[in-house]
Structures are given as C-alpha cells and as structure tokens.
Design a protein with these regions (language model features):
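Mature catalytic domains of secreted/periplasmic carbohydrate-active enzymes
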Residues: 1-435
C-alpha cells in the first residue's frame, strides 16, 4: 500500500526549488527536415520516408558542451535532454534497438556526452523520455490519435503485442538509470486518452527508477499531460504521481496546492519560438524581456521555468535563441539572487511588477515607474531594515513625502529625483525585513 511521505518529498525537491531555472533541449532526427519534432505525425510520414534522416544523421558541429555552456551563462541550474522523443530514435547506446545515435554516421552516445558535459559545468542532469514510440512495431498504429499511421487501415493493430512494447520501454528506462551516473530528473512524456497510469505499468516503472536512482525527481506525465494536475494535487497520490506538475506554455494563476492547502511543486515548460524541435521557418521568437518576466512570474508563484532550445541539424543553437540566452544571462548575473532559492511572498502582487521572497528578504521586481514614490502595499515602514538596488548596491531610502500621509501603515520607497529605472525590463530592489 503506497503512502506519501511529505518529509521525503521536501528533501528530494530542495535542490529543484533552489534552482528555479532550467534548459530543455529537443534534438533528434527531426532537426534534419527542420519542420518541428512532430513532423512525422503531422505529415503522416511513412517509416521508410523518415528513415532516410537516420541514414543521413551526421551533425558536423555537434558539441553538447556548447549547449551546456549556453545554459550556464543564461543562469540555468539544470538541463534536460530528449533521450528519446516520440519518433523512437534513441540518443543513447541501447541494447534494445538499432534505431540509435551510436548506429548513425555520427556514431556517438549523445546522452553520455551530454551528461558528462553537464556535470563538468556543475549543472543538474535531466533526461526526457517519451512513453510513446512511433518506430516500435508493437506500439498501436491505426486508430491511435498521435501515430503517423493513425488513418491507414493497412496498419491495423492485429498482431501487435503491447506488453512486448512495455518490456522494451522499461528496459530502455533501466538503461538510462543504470549507465549514465546520477540522474537528477526523469521527465516522462506523455499520457493521453486511456494511455496513462497502469497502462504503462507505471507503479512497476517508478519503483524501478527510484530503486536505481533513489534521489531522482519525476514529473507527473505518467498520469496526465496538461489535462489536470494529477493525483498529488488531488490529495490521493498514486505510487506514480511524480514530484512536480508540468504545465506546458501556461503559468498557473495562483500556483498549485492540494486540498489541504499544501504546495504542490510545478515547472512550466515553454518554447523560445513556436516549436520544440528545430523548425527552419519559425522566426517568431519570444523576447528576452518577456522570458525574464515569465521566469519571475513563475518564481513569484512558487514554480520553476524550463526554457527550451532546438539545435539545428548540425547541432548548433539557432542564432536568435543564442542571443536571447545571452540577454537573459546578463540579467541573471546581476539579479540571480532574486530567483535562486526564492518563492512566492504573502505580500499581494503590486501594480508595478512582482515580488519574490527568500526568508526575510523580499525582492521587488519593478517593471514600471509609478506616479510618485513606490508603494509597498502590505509592508509597514517600521518592519523594514533596508532597501538596496541589486545592480549597484545603492541604498533606496523610504519616502516621507506628504503625498502618502493618508497611508501611515504602508511604506513607500523613494527612487530619487530621477526615478528612471536602471533596467527597462526589471529593476530589482532587495528589501530586508527586520528579524
């Protein structure tokens, strides 16, 4: 009988909650057609047509240390790679199939290279693993709403042995948990329709993973993928509930809590443009300004932010993505202490931006000027020890202007005769409360 241990849960989640910011990497054969990671499904591509990318795969500029260094410079503390996506192509040396990177012209165990590079730079290591597999002959084809051959009767499922597929899938997860050292996150994807929970033999799978990697943390996608928060949030956790909810491209309005009011931890995953995998015609990139504010929003609500890149067919981060990561990194080098180890504050969201908190330190993320002195709703001036601007450490005094004399129980900060914000995206002030 499974029993949820809140203390153990908090222990294994601590590093994750301190980190707050991570990189997602979607990379595989689909970078060659350059039409996104779902290209085989969206175009209902025959396996023979897709296999030509397998025979071609030889990224001439492949170097995972460049991905890792870009993540580190952007201020990210963990990094997750797609060890296998829905197309079934394995970026690791597996004994279960020849559809793997070591059998391509590249001839490299990409997961091995990646995990080594990440640890060398001090980043926590995560692996994404797709529960579904469009390459395996025993995974449902005809009628499955995701499979490339879903509309072709000649691919009827008679004779397919789903249990044999599950044995294959479990064996691959065992390899990932055995052959690559300490894995900090296993990011499963995804569940839909009746393909969820024990359909994956999920209790058995999670037991194996936790036995091989006792301190690993798991997402909730053995249960659900964006359709509900899962059993932990519902207050009756299953043995395969996972450790964090994984909303995709949406930030929960108020964070996530179970029925008892205890926090359920979560991580928003988001693309930098419109696709996860490389798409050569997708030039709609989110600005660094927007992404910094989304990171702050996640932390101010008690969540993490996992930002994706999709390297091209040569293994190179697209220039626009690389530039955006550099911009984010410049912000994080100055203001990282307002993100790492921080969480939501009991102080209501202010009109001028957001607040993150770590102990008795409040970080005021000021996005825009106010009409007069900066109002600090919910904070009494007598409770404030100091206010400092993170960019240069200068003191920000409290305002004593007559204009707010009608609000004696609320503090106001004086940004000076020229209140121009030093960072047009987010000027961060550290307000320290008296102990």
């Amino acid at each position: 009988m499974y029993s949820f241990d809140r203390n153990e849960y908090e222990r294994r989640m601590k590093w994750f909650l301190d980190a707050r910011f991570g990189m997602f990497i979607h990379w595989g054969l689909y970078a060659i057609p350059a039409r996104g990671e779902w290209v085989r499904s969206t175009e209902q591509m025959e396996e023979a047509d897709y296999m030509r990318y397998f025979y071609e795969f030889d990224p001439r500029l492949y170097d995972p240390s460049t991905w890792v260094c870009a993540a580190k410079r952007a201020g990210m503390k963990y990094i997750i790679l797609t060890a296998k996506h829905h197309d079934g192509f394995c970026l690791f040396d597996t004994a279960t199939t020849g559809f793997k990177s070591t059998d391509t012209k590249l001839g490299r165990d990409i997961v091995k290279d990646f995990t080594y590079a990440a640890r060398a730079e001090g980043l926590h290591v995560g692996l994404y693993y797709s529960l579904i597999d469009w390459h395996h002959k025993d995974f449902p084809h005809y009628g499955d709403r995701q499979h490339p051959m879903r509309n072709r009767p000649k691919y009827a499922n008679e004779g397919r042995d789903f249990e044999r597929y599950l044995d294959y899938m479990h064996a691959q997860v065992r390899e990932l948990c055995t052959n690559y050292g300490k894995i900090d996150i296993m990011w499963f994807d995804f569940s839909y329709d009746d393909m969820r929970g024990e359909k994956w033999r999920a209790s058995e799978l999670v037991n194996m993973v936790r036995t091989l990697q006792p301190s690993i943390i798991l997402n909730n996608r053995l249960e659900c993928s964006g359709e509900g928060f899962g059993s932990l949030a519902q207050g009756h956790p299953t043995p395969y509930h996972g450790d964090f909810v994984s909303p995709e491209k949406i930030i929960p309005p108020r964070g996530i809590f179970d029925p008892a009011g205890d926090p359920v931890y979560w991580e928003v995953c988001a693309t930098m443009n419109q696709n996860w995998g490389y798409c050569g015609t997708d030039n709609y990139y989110k600005s660094a300004d927007m992404l910094i504010k989304k990171l702050v929003e996640c932390v101010s609500k008690g969540g993490n932010f996992l930002l994706n890149i999709g390297p091209d067919a040569n293994g190179v981060i697209p220039p626009r993505a690389a530039e955006t990561l550099e911009e984010i990194g410049r912000f994080m080098r100055v203001n990282g202490q307002s993100i790492y180890g921080c969480t939501k504050s009991a102080i209501p969201k202010p009109e001028w931006g957001r607040i993150t908190q770590k102990g008795n330190e409040l970080f005021l993320h000021v996005y825009e000027n106010t009409l007069g002195p900066l109002p600090l709703f919910g904070i009494n001036a007598q409770d404030i020890d100091s206010i400092r601007q993170l960019s240069d450490g200068r003191e920000i005094p409290l305002s004593h202007s007559w204009v707010h004399s009608d609000y004696p129980d609320m503090a106001f900060a004086d940004l000076g005769p020229d209140p121009t914000l030093v960072d047009g995206t987010d000027t961060v002030l550290k307000l320290t409360l008296k102990e």
